[in-house]
């Protein structure tokens, strides 16, 4: 394990990525889809740990987490990193933090895990990592010329991603968290496997198959008064699209990489409560990832851009 940690430190020295932020009354959060737990690149799990160390977040929402991977990552990250994962044979979602997990507060749903965390500064947060259903991907339907009714697109949203958001919001314990949100903020982070209604607007419909769509997962969070951190800081969807899908998946392999893959913002950090965001970035390391099928030696181990944001408690 010591050799692995030294390996990570050496790799980290090669990048001058700036990660400064206030630690006294602030928090840095990250969402990171780790693409089959790093299986698609050489030394994938070591690279996952490396990039977490480079970003230096307080809490990380992970997706595509295989069994035993959080154990491996916490060992590589070292003390004081700890983890909680969804209670399932295939965890899929997990939360890493270098702060204190409050015992007996973790929650699991079909696509998410949540927990209460106490920061070493004394602040408390409620934090969710989610990974919504990947099937019936909305942008594929929206860009299909045979699709001419919104109901056809929404049919895929109403059986997977939409209900999964409702499941989280309607948990009895989540409702109790919501009652205390003026004192303890709630963060919902992860891979939504779908775009935002704030991005598919009249301004952008020409690049979205000529559709304006109120995607239900993000719309429901907005109606529950959660804020989309990226769109709050960057409200101009044309100049700041914030694409997170994909770092490497640019063309569909089934047609010899000649048909473009729709690129979209599908990884989010939502918040509600007594914090103010002041910085958010998409992240793929310092070396440009090579697209599929030339990706196996990439330094950055994911097909999604990670997203991290800094908040100040108020």
Curated annotation (Swiss-Prot):
Subcellular location: Secreted
Glycosylation sites noted in the Swiss-Prot or TrEMBL record: 68, 72, 106, 256
Keywords carried by this UniProt record: Glycoprotein, Secreted, Signal
Pfam family membership, one: Exo_endo_phos
Position of the signal peptide: 1-18
Gene3D superfamilies: Endonuclease/exonuclease/phosphatase
InterPro entries for this protein: Endo/exonu/phosph_ase_sf, Endo/exonuclease/phosphatase
Gene Ontology annotations for the cellular component aspect, listed alphabetically: extracellular region
Entry annotated with the keyword Glycoprotein: yes
Record GO terms (molecular function): catalytic activity
Main location (coarse class): secreted
Entry protein name: Uncharacterized protein F14F9.5
The organism of origin for this protein: Caenorhabditis elegans
